Amino acid sequence: MLRLAKRIVLLSTGLVVLELLGASLQVRAQDVLPEAPARPRMSAPVDRNTDGETKGATYVSLDPSLNRLFSGEDPKSLTDLKALQTQQSKVAAKIHQVTVNLQHGSTQGSGVLINEEGYILTAAHVAGKPKQKMWVVLHDGRRVEGVSMGVNRDTDAGLVRILKTRDENNQPWPHAALPAVGERVKTGQWCIAGGHPGGWVSDRPAVIRIGRILAVTDSTVVSDCSLIGGDSGGPLFDLQGKLIGIHSRIGIDVDDNMHVPMNVYMESWDRLANSEAWGVLPGFRPIIGVTADRQSDTKSECIIGTVAPRGPAAKAGIVPGDRIVRFHNAD
């Protein structure tokens, strides 16, 4: 898909990248904590009901009249618009308490609490590397110590944990509602994003933005929620307040954003919880910037279907319809 082939920019502040942000990489030595907390006793991050669903602090029941809008259809009346706005406002009000700011060194990003023990989903480029000390800033400004755990750089999925499994009042940490196992996001679906754009601001809660799902693959969800630096690792919710993705990176425009879907975290959970690191971050591999025309039926040549604007192929003069008949002196 051409949209997914665009040049990309990691969203966390203090990390760098590409001339689009005009930023420079800053690296600061980190204090490494002792061993990360023991792995949870489950193969999924939370205790779930028989459907695999968990109703956390962000869950908002959906009126049957909203089922059509929930599935991605457009509002058709003023009544639809008001009902949609009301539902979005209810979810937005709950997102603040589970959206956190993550800090280590000069880098800041966002994250979301996903169980009572203080586990936090974020982006791999925010978590950095396993077993690093991190500060977790909660919705009310409290700062608590955390540690980075596993990072799947192939998909930009990261895991962090608050060191204490309960807060200072011995209460469990609030956490987001998670979808049922196998529940997938659909193109056109309405979504609600949270995060800390530009980093933590003491008198400002997590910033909420509304959008829709533009595209879905097994490893990426694309939305038009407007995101900028500092939002990386923040949560993306559906209209029921269920967590459906984690902010990863943007394309050329701030309303062309890629998120890591929940199935990636579920599939990688054991390795993430075991503080493993693997893969290469998206956007850091060499790319050509083309996709093949899948409708062409030939084994002797490859027909170019799309060319990413301003990518290496475009700069070399390759256009859709070109035929590749030889590569590296091989037919």
Language-model-detected regions and their locations in the chain:
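Conserved PDZ fold ligand-binding element
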Residues: 117-121, 244, 313-331
